[in-house]
Every structure is written in C-alpha cells, then in structure tokens.
C-alpha cells in the first residue's frame, strides 16, 4: 500500500516537473510580470528607481513582445513618457517584426511628450514611418496635424486631422481632433482676411 503512494507521489512530482518545464516557467514569468507592474509605481520613487524596476520587468519579459508593449502602454497611461519611450525603443530593437504603425506612432508621441512637447527630426521620422506602414494611423495623423499647425501649414493640418477623425473610433480622440481642426480653421481664416 505504501509503495502505491510512493509511486503515485513520484509520478505526481514528475508530472509537475514536466509541466513546469514545458508551461510553468512562462506562466511563472507572467505572474511575476503582473506583480511587478502592480508594485512598480510608488509615488515617491525616484526616476532612477523606476528605471531600474522597468529594466527588471523588461528582462523578465524579454521574449514576449506583448508584455513589453503592454508595459509601454501602462507607462504612457501613468504619464511616465520618458520611461514609455525607453520601453518602446527596447521593443523596436528587439522585436522588429512586431513593430507596426501603432508602435511607431506611440513611440513618436512618447518622445514628443517627454521632449517638452517639442518636435525634432527623430519624432517626425517616426511619424512618417508610421504613416508609410498605415496611412490611416490616427495617432500619427494627429501628431502630423499638430506639427503642421505649428509650422503654420493649416490646410495640410486640416487634411491630416480630417483623415484622423474619419478613422478614429474613440470619442476623446475625436474631441482632440475637433479642437485642433477648430484652431487651424480660425488661423486659416485670419490669414485669409
């Protein structure tokens, strides 16, 4: 009778070891990833502490592009634009096949926001690359329209924003686009008067 329990116990332990080897390690990493995200942002943490925590999370999910992208979006939502930009740069370097128009546009936006809302050549290049991959990328079109407005190129800004408005499904995005279009129309009208 005891021998049967030993065999059962050994087979159970062996099965658990095989499961962990085949599937458990990834599940364990996912749990740690989610746990780290919950503990990641303490209000009084320094930028360096946050950066180190992000690096450890990225290392934990180095073979999973979805987790890295989720992390970048999480950081963006927390207004941690410099950290989100850094995470997206890691994403584009390590997962080039998964780098689509939205990743490029989000990278451009995080760089713009972390650069005191000033455009530079890198940001403009990311916007153009995003639009080459997807000419209807709403985020890239909004940024392009904003840049065109700053350059006083109001007609092109209105074109960019009207395309963005057409493809946007998000009510908040549409309000932002409408505000930009309204400003561009006022500026264009004042130039024509």
Regions found by a protein language model. Give the residues of each.
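Structural register within alpha-helical repeat arrays
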Residues: 70-71, 107-109, 144, 181
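Canonical positions in the second alpha-helix
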Residues: 56-57, 91, 129-130, 163-164
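Alpha-helical adaptor scaffolds
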Residues: 39, 73-77, 83-133
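Long, contiguous interaction/recruitment modules in multidomain scaffold/adaptor proteins
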Residues: 1-52, 56-60
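Structural signature of tandem alpha-helical TPR/SEL1-like repeats
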Residues: 45-58, 80-87, 115-126, 153-160
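Residue-level recognition of tetratricopeptide repeat
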Residues: 64, 98-100, 137, 171
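Register position in tetratricopeptide repeats
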Residues: 77, 113, 150, 183-187
């Amino acid at each position: 009778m005891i021998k049967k329990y030993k065999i059962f116990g050994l087979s159970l332990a062996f099965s658990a070891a095989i499961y962990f080897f085949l599937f458990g390690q990834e599940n364990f990493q996912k749990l740690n990833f989610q746990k780290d995200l919950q503990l990641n942002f303490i209000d009084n943490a320094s930028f360096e502490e946050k950066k180190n925590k992000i690096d450890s999370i990225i290392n934990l999910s180095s073979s999973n592009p979805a987790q890295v992208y989720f992390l970048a979006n999480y950081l963006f939502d927390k207004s941690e634009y410099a950290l989100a930009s850094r995470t997206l740069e890691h994403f584009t370097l390590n997962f080039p096949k998964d780098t689509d128009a939205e990743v490029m546009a989000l990278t451009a936006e995080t760089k713009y926001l972390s650069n005191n809302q000033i455009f530079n050549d890198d940001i403009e290049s990311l916007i153009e690359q995003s639009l080459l991959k997807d000419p209807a990328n709403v985020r890239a079109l909004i940024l392009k329209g904003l840049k065109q407005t700053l350059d006083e190129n109001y007609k092109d800004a209105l074109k960019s924003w009207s395309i963005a408005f057409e493809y946007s499904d998000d009510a908040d995005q549409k309000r932002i686009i409408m505000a930009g279009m309204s400003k561009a129309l006022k500026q264009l009208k004042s130039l024509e008067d």
